[in-house]
């Protein structure tokens, strides 16, 4: 089945249900993308930092060559990493990422985090990661502001390298600031969003301003448990939640479908991933039923304001308090 779409403020239609590419292993990434296209996915959410964009591009190229899709049928999303925030570095790295994907433009290109770090040349290390030395040294840029970076992002649109641009992991004040200085308004805001971290005020702000919200990590701690993260292990998996399981039984759906529908029913886009064809189909088919007001209220009561995707949860990073 095809995903419903959401209209962006840039005028383009974005599939509401896409396929996330974080932690998709390089060895299987091309096949995973190809199989997801066969299953009906059209939006693919990647990033420089995921380290698998070449393989993603191979999967896309094979699907186009085999006649499964045309380029214009796909909606390819990628992100600008923090070490490339300098105005003169944005376009060159975008062109490199486009080359990895074997495409001429991104449908959507995002600022990955609201943090400008010192430049690391791709010939030294790519993806560069968080640390300047590749080990432990954090070096904030002393010259580059988010406004300057956004100006360079806008020029990507002017040059046809990106059709829409957006932001990721921004909190409310950064969104407010962007709305003041932006010539081209952010089309989307991608955030960690699940029943344990609902961020209702941030979601409301974005939607009120005509910015589409995309939820990542819709299944909460599950993806972070694989990283042996203590914070993720401190709470029960959402798939095992009695509330979510009861709603899945009530609607004769899987817990994953309930978690995804909780977002999509509220106008939020989702980007789940899986390597299993049957689960690919289930995740894509999450908009064919509705949760009632009582269901939504029960999930709203699950909010713990627990964030998993922040640097201080991965490593000792006392200079990387991005969500303070």
Swiss-Prot record:
<dbReference type="InterPro" id="IPR036812">
    <property type="entry name" value="NADP_OxRdtase_dom_sf"/>
</dbReference>
<dbReference type="GO" id="GO:0019569">
    <property type="term" value="P:L-arabinose catabolic process to xylulose 5-phosphate"/>
</dbReference>
<dbReference type="InterPro" id="IPR020471">
    <property type="entry name" value="AKR"/>
</dbReference>
<keyword id="KW-0560">Oxidoreductase</keyword>
<keyword id="KW-0521">NADP</keyword>
<dbReference type="Pfam" id="PF00248">
    <property type="entry name" value="Aldo_ket_red"/>
</dbReference>
<feature type="binding site">
    <location>
        <begin position="273"/>
        <end position="283"/>
    </location>
    <ligand>
        <name>NAD(+)</name>
    </ligand>
</feature>
<protein>
    <recommendedName>
        <fullName>NAD(P)H-dependent D-xylose reductase xyl1</fullName>
        <ecNumber>1.1.1.-</ecNumber>
    </recommendedName>
</protein>
<feature type="binding site">
    <location>
        <begin position="217"/>
        <end position="226"/>
    </location>
    <ligand>
        <name>NAD(+)</name>
    </ligand>
</feature>
<comment type="similarity">
    <text>Belongs to the aldo/keto reductase family.</text>
</comment>
<comment type="pathway">
    <text>Carbohydrate degradation; L-arabinose degradation via L-arabinitol; D-xylulose 5-phosphate from L-arabinose (fungal route): step 1/5.</text>
</comment>
<feature type="binding site">
    <location>
        <begin position="168"/>
        <end position="169"/>
    </location>
    <ligand>
        <name>NAD(+)</name>
    </ligand>
</feature>
<keyword id="KW-0520">NAD</keyword>
<dbReference type="InterPro" id="IPR018170">
    <property type="entry name" value="Aldo/ket_reductase_CS"/>
</dbReference>
<dbReference type="InterPro" id="IPR023210">
    <property type="entry name" value="NADP_OxRdtase_dom"/>
</dbReference>
<feature type="binding site">
    <location>
        <position position="112"/>
    </location>
    <ligand>
        <name>substrate</name>
    </ligand>
</feature>
<feature type="active site" description="Proton donor">
    <location>
        <position position="50"/>
    </location>
</feature>
<comment type="pathway">
    <text>Carbohydrate metabolism; D-xylose degradation.</text>
</comment>
<keyword id="KW-0859">Xylose metabolism</keyword>
<comment type="function">
    <text>Catalyzes the initial reaction in the xylose utilization pathway by reducing D-xylose into xylitol. Xylose is a major component of hemicelluloses such as xylan. Most fungi utilize D-xylose via three enzymatic reactions, xylose reductase (XR), xylitol dehydrogenase (XDH), and xylulokinase, to form xylulose 5-phosphate, which enters pentose phosphate pathway. Also major aldose reductase in pentose and D-galactose catabolism. Reduces the pentose L-arabinose and the hexose D-galactose to their respective polyols.</text>
</comment>
<dbReference type="GO" id="GO:0042843">
    <property type="term" value="P:D-xylose catabolic process"/>
</dbReference>
<dbReference type="GO" id="GO:0032866">
    <property type="term" value="F:D-xylose reductase (NADPH) activity"/>
</dbReference>
<keyword id="KW-0119">Carbohydrate metabolism</keyword>
<dbReference type="InterPro" id="IPR044487">
    <property type="entry name" value="AKR2D"/>
</dbReference>
<feature type="site" description="Lowers pKa of active site Tyr">
    <location>
        <position position="79"/>
    </location>
</feature>
């Amino acid at each position: 089945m095809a995903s419903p779409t959401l209209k962006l403020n840039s005028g383009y239609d974005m599939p509401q249900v896409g396929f996330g590419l974080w932690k998709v292993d390089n060895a299987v990434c091309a096949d995973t993308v190809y199989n997801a296209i066969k299953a009906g996915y059209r939006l693919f959410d990647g990033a420089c930092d995921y380290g698998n964009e070449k393989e993603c591009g191979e999967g896309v190229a094979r699907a186009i060559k085999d006649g499964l899709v045309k380029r214009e049928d796909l909606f390819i999303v990628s992100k600008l990493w923090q070490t490339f925030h300098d105005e003169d570095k944005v376009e060159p790295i975008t062109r490199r990422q486009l080359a990895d994907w074997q495409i001429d433009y991104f449908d959507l290109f995002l600022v990955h985090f609201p943090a400008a770090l010192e430049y690391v040349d791709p010939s030294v290390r790519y993806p560069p990661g968080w640390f300047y030395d590749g080990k432990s040294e954090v070096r904030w840029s002393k010259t580059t502001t988010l406004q300057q970076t956004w100006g360079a992002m806008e020029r990507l649109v002017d040059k046809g390298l990106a059709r829409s641009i957006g932001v990721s992991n921004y909190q409310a004040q950064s969104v407010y600031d962007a709305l003041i200085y932006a010539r081209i308004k952010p089309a989307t805001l991608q955030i960690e969003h699940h029943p344990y971290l609902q961020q209702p005020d941030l979601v409301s702000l974005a939607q009120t301003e005509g910015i589409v919200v995309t939820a990542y990590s819709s299944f909460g701690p599950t993806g972070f448990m694989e990283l042996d993260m203590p914070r993720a292990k401190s709470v029960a998996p959402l798939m095992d939640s009695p509330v979510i399981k009861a709603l899945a039984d009530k609607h004769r759906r899987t817990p994953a479908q309930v978690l995804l529908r909780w977002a999509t029913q509220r106008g939020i886009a989702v980007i789940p991933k899986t390597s299993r064809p049957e689960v690919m189909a289930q995740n894509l088919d999450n908009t064919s039923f509705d949760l009632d007001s009582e269901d939504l209220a029960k999930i709203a009561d699950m909010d713990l304001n627990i964030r998993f995707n922040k640097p201080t949860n991965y490593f000792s990073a006392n200079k990387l308090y991005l969500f303070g």
